[in-house]
C-alpha cells in the first residue's frame, strides 16, 4: 500500500483489525531497540521543551541503561539537566550535566527530586519492563511517581493486555505508535498532557486491534511524501519516514532552523547521516535481554 503521510498517534479514527499470530510470516521491518529509544525520546523532548527556557527543565529517565541512546541524546540537548536511574550499569560515557544512579527508582527518590526541583519543570520518562501479570501494579507505580514529582510532562511505555475486553486507568495523554519496534509488538508510548494528574480509561481491545493494524498495514506500507531524499540512509518505509519527520521537528522547533532552507537541508543531512552511522558502528541492534522475535 502507498500512503502519503504517516500517522504517529493512535486516535479514534485509527485503523483496526483482529490480532492474529504471525510466527511463520516473513517480516519486512527492522527492530532496532536503542535507535527506537533515541528517536522516540527526541520526539518527546522536542514537543515538551521551550528551547529558550531549557534551563527550567529537568529530564528524569527511569530505565536508562546501558545508555547507548542517552550518550547520543546528550549531544542533541547539551544544556538539559539529565538524571538517570537503572539498577543495571550505564556502560557509556555520558557527558554534560548528568546524574547517574545505579539503583531502582522509588517513591523516596521521587520525593527527594520533587523537593530539590520544586521550581523546575520535571520531564519524566519511564522504560520499565515488567511481566503482564504485574501490569496494573506497574501503572499504579508510575502514576504515583508522576503525582509525587508534579511532572510537567511524562512519557511512559504502554503495553496493554492482549485478548481482554477490560480497560486500564492511567494518565490522560496521547498514545504514540512506535518507531523501529518489534514486528508484532503491542508496546507504544503514552505522552501525557501538560501538568495533569487526570486519569482516563484505555480499552485493551481497542489498543490490541489498533496495534495489530499498525503492525500489519501502517508499518508495512510505502510512504510517498518524503521531502528529504537520502537513499543511502533511508527508504520509504514507516520507520525511516517517521525518523525523518521527528528529526525535522527537532531541527525546526528546537534548533529554530527555517524549514526548507539551505541550513535546514544541510543540518538534516548531517544529523540523519550521523545517527545512522552511530547505530551501525557503536551499539548492538538488540538489547541483551531480548530473546527472540
Region spans (language model):
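Class I SAM-dependent methyltransferase Rossmann-like catalytic core
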Residues: 1-55, 293
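Rossmann-like AdoMet/SAM-dependent catalytic core
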Residues: 5-17, 60, 67, 168-293
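Well-ordered, non-membrane alpha-helical segments in soluble/globular domains
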Residues: 30-44, 100-103, 110-111, 133-148
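Conserved SAM-binding loop of SAM-dependent methyltransferases across substrates and taxa
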Residues: 66-77
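S-adenosyl-L-methionine
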Residues: 85-119, 128
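A short SAM/SAH-binding and catalytic strip from SAM-dependent methyltransferases
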Residues: 120-134
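Conserved beta-strand signature within the Rossmann-like core of class I S-adenosyl-L-methionine
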Residues: 150-159
Amino acid at each position: 500500500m502507498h500512503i502519503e503521510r504517516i500517522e504517529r498517534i493512535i486516535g479514534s479514527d485509527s485503523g483496526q483489525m483482529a490480532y492474529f499470530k504471525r510466527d511463520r510470516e516473513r517480516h519486512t521491518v527492522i527492530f532496532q531497540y536503542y535507535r527506537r529509544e533515541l528517536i522516540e525520546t527526541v520526539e518527546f523532548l522536542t514537543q515538551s521543551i521551550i528551547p529558550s527556557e531549557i534551563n527550567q527543565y529537568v529530564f528524569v529517565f527511569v530505565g536508562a541503561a546501558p545508555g547507548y541512546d542517552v550518550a547520543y541524546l546528550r549531544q542533541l540537548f547539551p544544556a538539559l539537566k539529565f538524571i538517570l536511574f537503572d539498577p543495571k550499569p550505564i556502560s557509556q560515557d555520558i557527558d554534560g550535566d548528568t546524574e547517574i544512579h545505579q539503583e531502582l527508582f522509588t517513591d523516596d527518590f521521587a520525593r527527594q527530586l520533587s523537593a530539590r526541583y520544586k521550581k523546575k519543570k520535571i520531564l519524566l520518562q519511564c522504560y520499565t519492563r515488567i511481566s503482564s501479570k504485574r501490569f496494573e501494579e506497574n501503572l499504579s507505580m508510575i502514576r504515583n511517581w508522576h503525582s509525587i514529582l508534579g511532572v510537567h510532562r511524562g512519557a511512559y511505555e504502554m503495553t496493554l493486555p492482549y485478548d481482554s475486553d477490560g480497560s486500564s486507568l492511567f494518565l490522560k495523554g496521547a498514545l504514540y505508535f512506535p518507531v523501529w519496534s518489534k514486528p508484532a509488538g503491542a508496546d507504544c508510548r503514552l505522552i501525557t498532557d501538560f501538568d495533569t494528574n487526570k486519569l482516563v480509561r484505555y480499552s485493551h481491545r481497542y489498543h490490541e486491534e489498533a496495534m495489530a493494524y499498525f503492525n500489519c498495514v501502517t508499518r508495512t506500507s510505502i510512504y510517498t511524501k518524503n521531502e528529504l531524499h537520502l537513499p543511502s540512509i533511508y527508504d520509504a518505509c514507516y520507520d525511516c519516514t517517521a525518523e525523518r519527520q521527528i528529526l525535522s521537528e527537532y531541527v525546526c522547533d528546537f534548533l529554530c532552523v527555517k524549514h526548507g532552507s539551505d541550513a535546514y537541508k544541510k543540518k538534516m543531512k548531517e544529523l540523519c547521516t550521523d545517527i545512522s552511522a552511530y547505530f551501525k558502528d557503536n551499539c548492538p541492534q538488540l538489547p541483551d535481554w531480548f530473546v527472540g522475535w
